[in-house]
Amino acid sequence: MEPVDPRLEPWNHPGSQPKTACNNCYCKRCCYHCLYCFTKKGLGISYGRKKRSQRRRTPQSSKSHQDLIPEQPLSQQQGDQTGQKKQKEALESKTEADPCD
């Protein structure tokens, strides 16, 4: 074993770089070419930017599901205000009539 120059970075040591360049082949030999090829091709790990998958858009001719909901009249959404007033008046009259205290 030859002594290694201590001033060299570990990734520049002799024998640390493969003699051939990396390629896009996924055969067994190329998957074990170097550590980078093994993680990228062999294990399928890549740390690059991921492309956003676009959502499927509904065709122009089809209606959206929101169009199928019928609109409700405003009186049902807000509630019956007169019924609440009558209930309050009935409660007040009952409390006045009961001499429990």
UniProtKB/Swiss-Prot annotation:
Region feature Cysteine-rich, mapped onto this chain: 22-37
Keywords per UniProt: Acetylation, Activator, AIDS, Apoptosis, Host cytoplasm, Host nucleus, Host-virus interaction, Inhibition of host innate immune response by virus, Inhibition of host interferon signaling pathway by virus, Interferon antiviral system evasion, Isopeptide bond, Metal-binding, Methylation, Modulation of host chromatin by virus, Modulation of host PP1 activity by virus, Phosphoprotein, RNA-binding, Secreted, Transcription, Transcription regulation, Ubl conjugation, Viral immunoevasion, Zinc
Keyword hit for RNA-binding: yes
Region of interest (Disordered), ranges: 1-20, 48-101
Location of region: Interaction with the host capping enzyme RNGTT: 49-86
Motif mapping: Nuclear localization signal, RNA-binding (TAR), and protein transduction: 49-57
Keyword hit for Transcription: yes
Pfam entry (one): Tat
UniProt-annotated stretches for the region Core: 38-48
Region Transactivation, residue ranges: 1-48
Sites bearing Asymmetric dimethylarginine, chain numbering: 52
This protein's domain notes: The cell attachment site mediates the interaction with ITGAV/ITGB3 and ITGA5/ITGB1 integrins, leading to vascular cell migration and invasion. This interaction also provides endothelial cells with the adhesion signal they require to grow in response to mitogens.
Family: Belongs to the lentiviruses Tat family.
Remaining remarks: HIV-1 lineages are divided in three main groups, M (for Major), O (for Outlier), and N (for New, or Non-M, Non-O). The vast majority of strains found worldwide belong to the group M. Group O seems to be endemic to and largely confined to Cameroon and neighboring countries in West Central Africa, where these viruses represent a small minority of HIV-1 strains. The group N is represented by a limited number of isolates from Cameroonian persons. The group M is further subdivided in 9 clades or subtypes (A to D, F to H, J and K).
Subunit details: Interacts with host CCNT1. Associates with the P-TEFb complex composed at least of Tat, P-TEFb (CDK9 and CCNT1), TAR RNA, RNA Pol II. Recruits the HATs CREBBP, TAF1/TFIID, EP300, PCAF and GCN5L2. Interacts with host KAT5/Tip60; this interaction targets the latter to degradation. Interacts with the host deacetylase SIRT1. Interacts with host capping enzyme RNGTT; this interaction stimulates RNGTT. Binds to host KDR, and to the host integrins ITGAV/ITGB3 and ITGA5/ITGB1. Interacts with host KPNB1/importin beta-1 without previous binding to KPNA1/importin alpha-1. Interacts with EIF2AK2.
Name the UniProt record assigns to this protein: Protein Tat
Organism: Human immunodeficiency virus type 1 group N (isolate YBF30)
